């Protein structure tokens, strides 16, 4: 992501978490993933964890969790709220993280609303980073599709990418599935509306559960 787009996104999210009361209840995607992670023995790494609502939710299921976010404001708040030794919050650029060094055991990546918040170059770095890991087991992904009603709104800044109050890059489900299938066994892949309604927003979302080959 170029410096201008990164600046817009950083300012937006720092302001969002500083001034606005973001949802505290676990997301519908976290609830969807519950049956798949309930007895998981590894660590759940929540990329772009925000206020940690899903990270905390998974921790309440007795899972080891690490929440990663670039926002200094929100990571500081999350650290103050945490009450368990089995949950950590780190301020990091997840596209550059050495995930194997962060955990002592196997881990899975939980990525909700993250793929559509980063540009193609950052996505490539992230997947290259993830695929280099020897401890990765599962991917859990939820992201806005190119079929979402917000597609095309705002200033176009790249392929399927637009800026309104912040940056969004809508994901092509066919390309995503093709890319993941090279390295993962797809356990679940679907696109639908109704997954995450919030006031007047009812996005078209892609949901993925995939296991490393």
Regions found by a protein language model. Give the residues of each.
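Class I (Rossmann-like) S-adenosyl-L-methionine-dependent methyltransferase catalytic domain
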Residues: 1-101, 118-125, 129, 137-213
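A conserved beta-strand element that flanks and buttresses the S-adenosyl-L-methionine
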Residues: 110
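Hydrophobic adenine-recognition pocket in adenosine-nucleotide-binding enzymes
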Residues: 114
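Hydrophobic pocket-lining residues that define ligand/cofactor binding sites across diverse proteins
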Residues: 134
